[in-house]
Amino acid sequence: MRRILAAIVGFILYLPAFPQQRIQPKNIEIVRDSFGVPHIFADTDAEVAYGLAWAQAEDDFASMQEPMLPVKNLMGRVQGKKGAAGDYAFALFRCREITEEKWNTLSPGFIKLAEGYVQGINAYARKHPEEVLHEKLFPISVKEYISSAVFALTIFNGADQALIRIFNNSEWEVPELNNKGSNAAAVNAGQTSSGETFLFINAHQPNTGSQAFYEAHLCSKEGLNITGGLLAGGPCILHGVNENLGWAHTVNYCDRVDEYQLEMNPANSLQYKFDGQWYNLEEKTVRLRVKGIPIAVKRKVYWSRYGATMKNKQGFFAIRLGANMKIGVLDQWYQMDKARNFSEFYAAIDKQELSMFNIMYADRYDTIFYISNALMPVRDASPVYN
């Protein structure tokens, strides 16, 4: 089915360093094939991102909204006690503050893309208020949107499990390996009977919800021409192929998270030792709103030089991981989308914003490549450290 988006008045969002350009929906074309996959065409990458947001929202707006709820402290209001844990974790891991602190590390081109995507989300929410999960969720700003991505990657990297262990006063246990998992392979042309280079992808994702792949084709006059999969709320392809190259992600199991028990000052219960000196824990009270409970529930969140810090019966524990230190993972995927050869692709992944995942790569020039990618610390190998 072929149609052109009707003109819709978008929200103009304020962004200090980079003034936004208002997207004109009439310049965007969404063509759905016989499978319902959207093929989105426009002059600029930002316009394509607007169209992608609109197409995703048409298909599953609820899943798109879910990762954004903690940004507005609304997950508890929508999902009850379980959701309130997400609101607490968002505050605990300081996703909003980290986004603000690292904002200038994002490329201007990506910021324009994100602006277009957010304008598309806000426009759809305004046009379809009956589909909005909570009346206070929209409009959402670009910085709020990026902070939601930081939170999602922080949780996906295992911070949620560390949080649960500390909350339950339980020790870390070696997990049993699951024999089921995603698969990917790249085969050089010299090893195939047809003389062609092959890239195989068999990603194991659920069929529904925010972790399900959403397939799309994005095409602009600024060099974006890629098809593949993304997760709910993604502004670009996270796993796919363009005219010149392709890549696959599978989950790897690198040790990306450290948990520290802090040595507290006997003379001051909110001071901890770091490099031989005592430092004050940063303390903040968050007000959690829970569906069905008329009053706010107050909880303390702490921050140390190690990172997000919690208190349990055994003392204070901090959670430290690379995913909670950077904000440019979507920017990196955007640069991967636009890469024309291995040199450009490697330059994109060399930014080291992606905190996990295997990367399997192949291109039309018969280059194949694999890396088990992660943001991991250089740890002290002595038993005392562990």
Placement of each model-derived feature along the sequence:
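Bacterial Sec-dependent N-terminal signal peptides
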Residues: 1-21
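Mature extracytoplasmic enzyme cores
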Residues: 21-386
